Design a protein with these regions (language model features):
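Polysaccharide-binding surfaces and accessory modules of carbohydrate-active proteins
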Residues: 1-202
Length: 202
């Protein structure tokens, strides 16, 4: 199992890719080509954003930067949402990473629940407006995951009456794939869940 993926990051001249001010003239450093934990719009990362806020002046750039972290000796819970909870057999741990957006004062907290015995990591996110003006939240995902390129496949489930959850399998390519239901709820037509696996995994 890989523990440190930094050796897989290929740094080369990324001409015409956006560079943050801190990179100076280093054209090998671009938010558009490096793995991101929180991709956001307006800062040189052109992938789909995880968080999109609109400020009172109409701007939607959001530059979330690491601020602090905390390790809790219990699992986290999100009110009204399903979750894994501490039991007598296993007590989870939680890593909370706090990121701040300097211009707006918005704080993004990332929660990582770890259940080591079950080999499970859960993720949630919470946005807090600590600024002096209102913001409009246009988009908020609980997580975004950049994976280094390998031969992955996506398994998802479509169906119809009396033939629910028919497994479909497609290779991951340079394309956008959306999994979801347009009925307003999950159903026998579509189950909004995905399995990401290595090519040919059974």
């Amino acid at each position: 199992m890989r523990k440190n993926l930094s050796g897989l990051i290929f740094c080369t001249d990324m001409g015409f890719a956006g560079n943050p001010e801190e990179a100076g003239s280093d054209r090998t450093y671009s938010l558009d080509t490096l793995p991101q934990e929180v991709p956001s719009s307006g800062v040189g990362d052109y992938r789909d954003d995880m968080v999109r806020i609109r400020q009172v002046d109409g701007s939607c750039a959001a530059d979330f930067r690491f601020d602090s972290y905390e390790i809790l000796d219990h699992s986290y819970a999100v009110p009204g949402m399903p979750a894994l909870y501490d039991t007598e057999e296993e007590k989870g741990e939680t890593l909370v990473i706090t990121m701040k957006e300097k211009a707006s004062g918005v704080v993004l907290k990332l929660f990582y629940g770890v259940f080591e015995n079950e080999n499970v990591i859960t993720r949630a996110a919470r946005l807090e407006n600590h600024g002096e003006t209102a913001i409009e939240l246009e988009k908020m995902l609980s997580f975004s995951m950049d994976l280094m390129y390998e031969n992955y496949e996506v398994i998802y489930f479509s169906g119809r009456h009396a033939m629910e959850r028919t497994a479909e399998r497609i290779p991951v390519q340079h394309a956008k794939v959306e999994i979801g239901s347009t009925r307003g709820t999950s159903s026998h037509h579509y189950n909004p869940a995905v399995i990401l696996c290595e090519e040919g995994a059974g």
